[in-house]
């Protein structure tokens, strides 16, 4: 009977250590997601390129703000980045006090909402960037990336960061769900 009790007491510190490790991983993933969404918003928000057409006086300017889907992308990534920054203190609190159930549940709900927002924004922006690269012959939309290399490279790069943030948010949701299930 003593060995059973001893096994239970030795299991509690191990469980607490695992819970602390999960909380530290949660914090690290949140910091990386902040960097990813913020970099995506900044890269897209500062994207513009000017192309002289016939003379230096007639120019074509490509800016992210000309396309509503890209504007939505910048705003959505900024919102998700701000949320992730605001969630960092709660993530730190989970490291200190690992028994918090309700705050983890709140994080799961808001993480899922932010995942939906960044998914919608990334999908809308991906459609526009695809059209910029490939065009659409049936709709008579020409591909513009042959002329606007910098614009297309920056928009594509910001999409990569945003899709990376989507993966990180999925991992955060799964991590929080596993931490709740262990309790």
From Swiss-Prot:
Residues 1-23, 93-104, 180-183 are cytoplasmic. Keywords: Cell membrane, Cell wall biogenesis/degradation, Glycoprotein, Membrane, Transmembrane, Transmembrane helix. It is found in: Cell membrane. Residues 45-71, 126-158 are extracellular. Glycans are attached at residue 48. The chain crosses the membrane at residues 24-44, 72-92, 105-125, 159-179. The keyword Glycoprotein applies. GO terms for biological process: cell wall organization. InterPro entries: CASP/CASPL, CASP_dom, CASPL. It is a multi-pass membrane protein. One of its GO terms (cellular component) is plasma membrane. Pfam families: CASP_dom. Belongs to the Casparian strip membrane proteins (CASP) family. PANTHER family: CASP-LIKE PROTEIN, CASP-LIKE PROTEIN 1U1. Homodimer and heterodimers. Regulates membrane-cell wall junctions and localized cell wall deposition. Required for establishment of the Casparian strip membrane domain (CSD) and the subsequent formation of Casparian strips, a cell wall modification of the root endodermis that determines an apoplastic barrier between the intraorganismal apoplasm and the extraorganismal apoplasm and prevents lateral diffusion. This is Casparian strip membrane protein 2.
């Amino acid at each position: 009977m003593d060995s059973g009790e001893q096994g239970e007491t030795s299991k509690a510190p191990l469980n607490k250590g695992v819970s602390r490790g999960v909380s530290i991983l949660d914090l690290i993933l949140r910091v990386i997601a902040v960097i990813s969404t913020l970099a995506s918003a900044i890269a897209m928000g500062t994207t513009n390129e000017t192309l002289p057409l016939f003379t230096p006086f007639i120019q074509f300017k490509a800016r992210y703000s000309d396309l509503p889907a890209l504007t939505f992308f910048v705003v959505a990534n900024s919102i998700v980045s701000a949320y992730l920054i605001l969630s960092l203190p709660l993530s730190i609190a989970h490291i200190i006090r690992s028994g918090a159930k309700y705050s983890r549940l709140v994080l799961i709900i808001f993480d899922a909402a932010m995942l939906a927002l960044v998914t919608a924004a990334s999908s809308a922006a991906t459609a526009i960037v695809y059209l910029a690269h490939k065009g659409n012959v049936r709709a008579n939309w020409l591909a513009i990336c042959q002329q606007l290399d910098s614009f297309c490279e920056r928009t594509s790069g910001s999409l990569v960061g945003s899709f990376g943030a989507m993966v990180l948010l999925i991992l955060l949701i799964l991590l929080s769900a596993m931490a709740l299930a262990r309790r």
